[in-house]
A protein has these predicted regions:
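Short, cationic interaction patches enriched in Lys/Arg with P/S/T/G and frequent prolines
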Residues: 1-46
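Short, charge/polar-rich alpha-helical segments
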Residues: 41-67
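Charged, long alpha-helical assembly modules
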Residues: 78-137
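Extended, amphipathic, non-transmembrane alpha-helical segments
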Residues: 65-80
């Protein structure tokens, strides 16, 4: 019989590989979570499409509201110019409407930017999820 000698235990090598093994374990755990959450890449793609469709609807609604508020602003500005031409003082009510209108325009623009950012983030998140699920399939 031939007895083969094993290499001696190298603690430095084991310690350097422990980081890699821990990273691989985390990756396997994340993969299992993805599999439980979505099952297949097609399911994840459907979920992504549904979310993006909802974002598009919200963005379209915000844009319609913005157009309406901008039309209101034009009307308020015309009223302001009419008072100015007549040499009358601009009523406080009209000044308040203009200020409130401007705040609404600013808020809606911020909402649109936020929704567009969320849309892009959702696209990138689901792209990585779908790619990972495709490699697992």
């Amino acid at each position: 019989q031939i007895i083969k000698r094993n290499k001696s235990f190298n603690s430095e090598l084991d310690q350097s590989q422990s980081h890699i093994r821990a990273q691989q374990a985390r990756q396997r755990e994340q993969d299992m979570k993805l599999k439980r959450a979505y099952g297949t890449s097609k399911t994840a793609a459907m979920k992504r499409d549904e979310l993006l469709k909802n974002y598009n609807k919200q963005i379209a609604l915000q844009q319609r509201q913005l157009k309406q508020i901008q039309k209101d602003r034009i009307m308020f500005k015309r009223q302001e110019m009419e008072h100015f031409r007549k040499g009358q003082a601009i009523p406080n009510d009209l000044k308040d409407r203009l200020n409130y209108n401007m705040q609404n325009i600013t808020n809606i623009k911020k909402n649109i930017e936020s929704l567009q950012s969320d849309y892009r983030n959702t696209q990138t998140q689901y792209a990585t999820i779908i790619n990972r699920l495709e490699t697992l399939e």
